[in-house]
Structures are given as structure tokens and as C-alpha cells.
Curated annotation (Swiss-Prot):
The lineage of its organism: Bacteria, Bacillati, Actinomycetota, Actinomycetes, Micrococcales. Binds 1 [4Fe-4S] cluster per subunit. It holds the Pfam family LYTB. It comes from Leifsonia xyli subsp. xyli (strain CTCB07). This is 4-hydroxy-3-methylbut-2-enyl diphosphate reductase. Signal peptide: none annotated. GO terms for biological process: dimethylallyl diphosphate biosynthetic process; isopentenyl diphosphate biosynthetic process, methylerythritol 4-phosphate pathway; terpenoid biosynthetic process. [4Fe-4S] cluster binds at C25, C109, C207.
Length: 337
């Protein structure tokens, strides 16, 4: 794989422009490892509320290892271990798990937890919260659940034109972490036209990984005839990457879960293929796409890097405590009298 310089070469013979950063973000990596470590520490089954991350390959691999995915905590046997997904949960879900005596491991992404804390603080300070996000998404449900009497959901820029608030001087916007940056800023612009005193969150709610992947695919799309985004249909950030690619110059863009879904007709007359992946996609799936494209004559892979990522999150505290306790038990057991 050749590294790409500042300027992408002009279209020519068959090649792949591989976006970087791509794939797993720190929050997804932490959540997946949390389930794997829980299975290792407690043994199967370990229950997970909702999909741990929005990727069918990851979910099926964890199921193979002994994870059981459920929609709600009342499906979990009393006293069992349950992992809350990276998208976060409401206080009501936490309480329901406690009522069943479940041993909960909270794998909520710390960047989502940050939004939860913002919602609690602004609600406490008597602000109305305009939450920009997609109705029905687990992350939105979790955030809204932290301030249910104060949150109004804004699904799109058009909805910003019709939202009503009680006090336009005490209103703040927050957002789902996986949205299109451009669309979110357009929504905020239109909200501020109606509510000039609209407050911003203390820091960006859209996560670094979502932003970085969108910036990279914008660069790639400018020179691509076709863009392939690896990611699942229910992955908000993967779907947004397809939209961004089309907005920034790609002649066509498609989302696939696996390389086997790439259609030959997509490649007809195509010289440059852009490739990226959503934040919940393991790199092995991208490599399978590259291998498939190489077989079709696209063996020249040029990486388009727009940012470096080195953020890492520690495991959930509940898991760290149990793992540390197990080490202490082993240490004590190994001492000679």
C-alpha cells in the first residue's frame, strides 16, 4: 500500500483510494473488548442489551463466543451479567437491571456519557434541550432518558423550522454523536435563526471519529468514480459516510457489510474506487473488500490520511474491578505459608 501525498493524483488507471482514519473508534473498541473480557472472566452466557455496536459481523462473532443479545433487561435471567451497549442507556434501564439483580457492565462510550452529563446539567439549570438526532436510535433514547421532561428531539434541518420552545432565552442544543457534521451545523443554524439566544454545548457532541471519517471521505470522494463504505444498515455513521461521499463528488456510493455484496456492474467504467468503513467496522472486513477489488484489477491502493488517531479508553469500571480482584485472588493463592 502506498501512502498518499497532500494532493491526490488525477484519475487514471484502476486504483483504490483508501480513506484514513476508518473503522473502529475508541468507544467501539472498548465496548467489544468489554464483552470479550466479560465472557473470559465470567464464562458464557453474558447478556448484552441491544447490539453492542451497530455491526452485524461483530455481533455474530460475539454470539459465537457466547454472548446473548436481548432487547430489554426483562429478558435476562435474574442475577446474570449484562453489558450495556456503546450507545448508552437511560437511568430507567439501569434501574430495571438493578431491580432484577443483574450484574451490569456499562460499556457506554465515554463520549456519549459526556452528552448524558450535559443533558442532566442543563435540565437541572432549567434549560430546554433541543436534541439533534434520529428518532428511535438507541443513543438518542438513552440521552433523552436522562432529562425526559426537558428534551425535544430535532430529526432534521427542516424540523428546526417548526420546533416550539417555552422560553427562547433558556434553550440549548445537544446532538447524537454519530451525525453528519454538515447537516447538524445546518440544523443549528436554522434553530439559531429562530432562537438567537440558543446556547451551544460546552464542547463538540459529534465524536472525533465521526468527524475524522467524514473529513477523510470528503477528500477521497473528490477523486473517486465510486465509493464503497463498509458498514451495517443500522450504523448511523456508516450511512452518513455514503451521503457525504455523494455530496462531495463521488459519482456513485454504496454501503456493504461484506465484500461479497459488491456488484460487478458498480465497477463498469470505474477507474478510481474510494473505500472507507464506519466506526463499528473491524479492519478485516475492509481488507476483504480490498482483496476483492484487487481481483477485479484494482490492486493499486493509495491511502488518503487526513488525521492521526491514538485515543484509547479504559475498560468499564465494573469489569476492571472484577479483573483486578481475580488477579488478587491468584496472587494470594500463589503465596507460600
Amino acid at each position: 500500500m502506498r501512502g498518499l501525498l497532500q494532493d491526490i493524483p488525477v484519475r487514471g488507471q484502476k486504483r483504490v483510494l483508501l480513506a484514513a482514519p476508518r473503522g473502529y473508534c475508541a468507544g467501539v473498541d472498548r465496548a467489544v473488548i468489554a464483552v470479550e473480557k466479560a465472557l473470559e472472566r465470567y464464562g458464557a452466557p453474558v447478556y448484552v442489551r441491544k447490539q453492542i455496536v451497530h455491526n452485524i459481523h461483530v455481533v455474530s462473532e460475539l454470539e459465537r463466543q457466547g454472548a446473548i443479545f436481548v432487547d430489554e433487561v426483562d429478558e435476562v435471567p435474574e442475577g446474570a451479567h449484562i453489558v450495556f451497549s456503546a450507545h448508552g442507556v437511560s437511568p430507567a434501564v439501569v434501574a430495571a437491571a438493578a431491580d432484577r439483580g443483574l450484574r451490569a457492565i456499562d460499556a457506554t462510550c465515554p463520549l456519549v456519557t459526556k452528552v448524558h452529563r450535559e443533558a442532566v446539567r442543563f435540565a437541572r439549570d432549567d434549560f430546554e434541550i433541543l436534541l439533534i438526532g434520529h428518532e428511535g436510535h438507541e443513543e438518542v433514547e438513552g440521552t433523552a432518558g436522562h432529562a425526559p421532561e426537558r428534551v425535544t428531539l430535532v430529526n432534521s434541518p427542516d424540523e428546526a423550522d417548526t420546533i416550539e420552545v417555552k422560553d427562547p432565552d433558556r434553550v440549548v442544543w445537544l446532538s447524537q454523536t454519530t451525525l453528519s457534521v454538515d447537516e447538524t451545523m445546518e440544523t443549528v443554524r436554522r434553530l439559531r435563526e429562530r432562537f438567537p439566544n440558543l446556547q451551544n454545548p460546552p464542547s463538540d457532541d459529534i465524536c472525533y471519529a465521526t468527524q475524522n471519517r467524514q473529513v477523510a471521505i470528503k477528500k477521497v470522494a473528490q477523486s473517486a468514480d465510486l465509493v464503497i463504505v463498509v458498514g451495517s444498515a443500522n450504523s448511523s455513521n456508516s450511512v452518513r459516510l455514503v451521503e457525504v461521499a455523494l455530496e462531495y463528488g463521488a459519482k456513485a456510493a454504496y454501503r456493504v457489510d461484506y465484500a461479497s455484496e459488491i456488484r460487478q456492474e458498480w465497477l463498469d467504467g470505474v477507474a478510481t474506487v474510494g473505500v472507507t468503513s464506519g466506526a463499528s467496522v473491524p479492519e478485516v472486513l475492509v481488507q476483504e473488500v480490498l482483496a476483492d477489488l484487487a481481483g477485479a484489477g484494482y490492486a493499486d491502493v493509495q491511502e488518503v490520511k487526513t488525521a492521526e488517531e491514538d485515543l484509547m479508553f479504559s475498560l468499564p469500571k465494573e469489569l476492571r474491578k472484577d479483573i483486578a480482584g481475580k488477579r488478587d485472588e491468584r496472587a494470594l493463592g500463589g503465596r507460600r505459608s
